[in-house]
Amino acid sequence: MFEGPVQDLIDELGKLPGIGPKSAQRIAFHLLSVEPPDIDRLTAVLNKVRDGVTFCAVCGNVSDEERCRICGDARRDASLICVVEEPKDVQAVERTREFRGRYHVLGGALDPLSGIGPDQLRIRELLNRIGERVDGVEVAEVIIATDPNTEGEATATYLVRMLRDIPGLTVTRIASGLPMGGDLEFADELTLGRALAGRRAMA
């Protein structure tokens, strides 16, 4: 254990996802060794993110405006919605250059053991988007692109149950080419693109 601000810094860094005690200590001592202007730039960026980044009022993606760039793009197909768990998954799908619709970010996946049920996700907002139409366009297809793990599959099953009886709506699930237990964000562009192209209709 170190003392004072150094230990405080290590403790805070250790709260970040994927950062263990040793990594937190290594990052902390790196920060102590860099020049003050570099620290100032990092601090400025963190403050900018805190003050200027929010979540899109329409889809839930990260944005620096009320509406994200994708939701504000009239060239995107508003009749097609791809449902993902997190904003990072939006970027994964975008890298494939295979999808020209819009997105809906749930903000996670169903995980009862962690206290995450339907009310903790943006499922109601999805139903509202479909019911109210998107920019006056009727939603024709919802692609479920949750992660291929236990929580993602449970979420997909729940969504199918909620959506399948909506008249005129096709509900599809990305193909099973992704490795089970993986995260969408780590899939390569080719594999994810094929999973999108090979999506299957859900009964």
UniProtKB/Swiss-Prot annotation:
Coiled-coil blocks: none
Annotated GO MF terms: DNA binding; zinc ion binding
One matching Pfam family: RecR_HhH
Source domain of life: Bacteria
UniProt cross-references to InterPro entries, sorted A to Z: DNA_Rcmb_RecR (IPR000093), Hlx-hairpin-Hlx_DNA-bd_motif (IPR003583), Rcmb_RecR (IPR023627), Rcmb_RecR_Znf (IPR015967), TOPRIM_dom (IPR006171), TOPRIM_RecR (IPR034137)
SMART domains listed in its UniProt record: HhH1 (SM00278), TOPRIM (SM00493)
Keywords: DNA damage, DNA recombination, DNA repair, Metal-binding, Zinc, Zinc-finger
GO terms, biological process: DNA recombination; DNA repair
Zn finger region (C4-type): 56-71
PROSITE patterns attached to this UniProt entry: RECR, TOPRIM
Entry keyword DNA damage: yes
Every Toprim domain range: 79-179
Family to which the UniProt record says this protein belongs: Belongs to the RecR family.
Functional note: May play a role in DNA repair. It seems to be involved in an RecBC-independent recombinational process of DNA repair. It may act with RecF and RecO.
PANTHER family: RECOMBINATION PROTEIN RECR
The name this protein goes by in its record: Recombination protein RecR
